[in-house]
Each structure stands twice: as C-alpha cells, then as structure tokens.
Amino acid sequence: MTIYTGSGVAIVTPFFEDGSVDYNTFGELIEFQIAEGTDAIIVAGTTGESSTMPDDEQVAVIDFAIKKVAGRIPVIAGSGVNDTAHSIRLSKEIEKLGPDALLVVTPYYIKTSQQGLIEHFEAIANSVDLPIVLYNVPGRTGQVMAPETILHLSQHKNIVAYKDAVGDIAHTLAVRNLVGDKI
C-alpha cells in the first residue's frame, strides 16, 4: 500500500444543520470512495472543513475515518493550522490515531517569509514519525511556498510528498523541474 500513486480523494466532512458531524453519511462517503477504487482518503483538509472544526472534533473525524477505512487504503490526515506550536500539538495527537501520513498546510492568515515556512514545516516534521505531505494552497492561506522552499524541505526524511493547489502551471512546472522525484 502506498500513498504516493493513484487518486487520493479529499473527502468532505458532512454536517447536520445544528453543526454536528453526520457520521453515518461520512461513513457512507468513505465506503463509496473505497468501492469506486480511490487509492487514498484525505481527511480534514480544506475540503473536509478542518479550519472550521475545534481540535477535538477534527481528531474525532480523523479517528472515525481511520477506523472506518480499517487499513484498506491509506488515510492522510490534515493536521496543519496557522501556528507552529498548535500544528505540532495537533499532529502529535493525530499521530496516535494511526494515519498513514499527515497533510500540513502552509500557515494561513499569518504571512511569513520562506525561511519562516521552512522553520515551521521542519519543526512539525521533527515532532512526529509520520510521512508529511506539504500542502500549498495560496487561495486559502494567502501565501505561496516557493519552489526553492519545497526543494529545501524535500531533504527532510519525513517530508515525502507535495499537494499543489497553487493554480499556476508555471509554478507547478518549476517545482517539478527543481524538486524532481524527491517528493
């Protein structure tokens, strides 16, 4: 089983009108994706509403997904938030649940330098023993991780993949040309 090939679905987190998670529907969505052949489930990313959930709810959603998937396909769990210390705490808590990897977004709202991004991601990567997928989504975070930053981070043993939601083919090609198959 690998998280690095095929189709990984960023799954939605369904809610009831009162704001509570609809776990029955969530379970049905997971089963549908597995039955239709998806290769991995990404839980509590942007599509999964992670930025709107308190930590305990996010952890519960991830825990439910891991148990529902039951090892049939990889589960990549969103654990990045807008500050480093919080991201580390959340990543460590989620690591205990047993996901196959963590999806860590660039900090949102707080714009930092590329060196600040390096320090942020390295601190998180140093705090866990799980593969980390870098998530570059400037439309949601307000900042772009530069190709050179991604290259630098690709040298870390725990940083193994990159999710590109930049929406600029020139940037994507620059990352590919610079980083190659390192992630």
Each language-model region and where it sits:
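Active-site beta->alpha loop and helix N-cap motifs at the rims of alpha/beta catalytic domains
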Residues: T2-V9, T13-V144
